[in-house]
């Protein structure tokens, strides 16, 4: 892969371990019990998620996780105009034309006019789109509006599926007593469970679980960010990006679209700095309100005594990596 500002349509994939739903419910119960005072997990039929503002009633059927682009597209201005993607094209690239897609990504600046957060929930074949975007205003406040496009920019983490109502794992937690946020707690708990069980998956270097789900912040406030417009200079990931982001306290009554993995199934050793695997982002959650102009990127809750989450989750058997921006940057460095 040479050094170029044009997009490369490369697609890689890796198998994931798919536990039985009862097993997954038990794993999540164990993962969450030390972090929240009340934890309830069960296998049940998914509620009608259109009532939560989603474009499909369920999250089941032919599930697959997708990681598109990457942070390098955000850091360097030379990619801001070229790193533009279309959800229907991504669905076709992973073999699920017309899919229901939900998750967390950046908006297209060509649609919004500025850099912004995107909360995609779109059933492509049914031509049903409930996507929202959130942007920073000139006075430093933020707003959220409907987004009438399938286009997104820079990076994204998604679940593609049929959008069917199927059995799922329902999780309800209240009153946080530990330090982890809701999503990180589940993700790290699954990683620990897999490490202890030594599960193998044919064709993968290491067994990992990938989860997609929709959850609601029923009560309490959360800490989230909204990206401002692009910087005109190259940023270094880390403190510089944290300082650039705009953080707000939002909630409750937030619908959260979440994608997370216990680890990268293409990596032999998860902590290795030489083994890049698929360069996967291990968790990404965006949220929107149905009653207020609030939306953005979820970090953690700010009111541990009052917080309550309830959500519906499913494992996916495969993760796809599309247009890997990290691999492109390594190729650029090698060409110098």
Regions found by a protein language model. Name each.
Residues 260, 270-274, 278-332:
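Compact beta-sheet-dominated globular domain cores
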Residues 80, 109, 123, 142, ...:
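Histidine (H) residue identity feature
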Residues 158-279:
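Long, positively charged binding patches that form subdomain-scale interaction surfaces
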Residues 7-206:
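Extended, low-hydrophobicity segments enriched in charged/polar residues
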Residues 36, 85, 100-102, 133, ...:
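Phenylalanine-focused residue identity feature
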């Amino acid at each position: 892969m040479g050094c170029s500002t044009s997009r490369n349509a490369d697609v890689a994939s890796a198998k994931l371990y798919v536990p039985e739903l009862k097993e997954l419910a038990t794993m999540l119960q164990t993962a969450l019990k030390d972090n929240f005072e009340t934890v309830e997990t069960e296998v049940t039929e998914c509620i009608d998620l259109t009532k939560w503002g989603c474009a499909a009633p369920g999250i089941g059927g032919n599930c697959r996780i997708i990681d598109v682009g990457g942070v390098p597209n955000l850091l360097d201005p030379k990619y801001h105009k070229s790193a533009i993607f279309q959800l229907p094209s991504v669905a076709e690239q992973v073999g699920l034309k017309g899919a229901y897609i939900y998750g967390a990504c950046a908006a297209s600046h060509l649609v919004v006019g500025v850099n912004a957060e995107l909360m995609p929930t779109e059933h492509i074949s049914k031509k049903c789109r409930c996507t929202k975007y959130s942007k920073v205003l000139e006075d430093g406040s933020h707003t959220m509006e409907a987004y009438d496009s399938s286009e997104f920019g820079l990076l994204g983490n998604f679940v593609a599926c049929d959008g069917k109502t199927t059995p799922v794992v329902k999780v309800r937690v209240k009153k946080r007593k530990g330090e982890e946020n809701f999503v990180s707690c589940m993700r790290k708990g699954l990683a620990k469970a897999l490490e202890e069980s030594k599960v193998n998956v044919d064709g993968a270097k290491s067994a990992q679980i990938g989860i997609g789900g929709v959850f609601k912040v029923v009560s309490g406030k959360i800490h989230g960010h909204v990206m401002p417009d692009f910087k005109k200079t190259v940023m270094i990931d880390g403190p510089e990006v944290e300082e650039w982001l705009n953080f707000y306290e939002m909630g409750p009554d937030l619908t959260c679209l979440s994608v997370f993995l216990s680890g990268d199934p293409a990596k032999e050793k998860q902590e290795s700095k030489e083994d890049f695997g698929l360069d996967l982002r291990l968790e990404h959650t965006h949220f929107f309100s149905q009653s207020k102009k609030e939306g953005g990127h979820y970090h953690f809750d700010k009111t541990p005594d009052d917080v309550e989450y309830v959500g519906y989750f499913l494992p996916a058997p495969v993760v796809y990596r599309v247009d890997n921006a990290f691999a492109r940057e390594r190729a650029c460095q090698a060409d110098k």
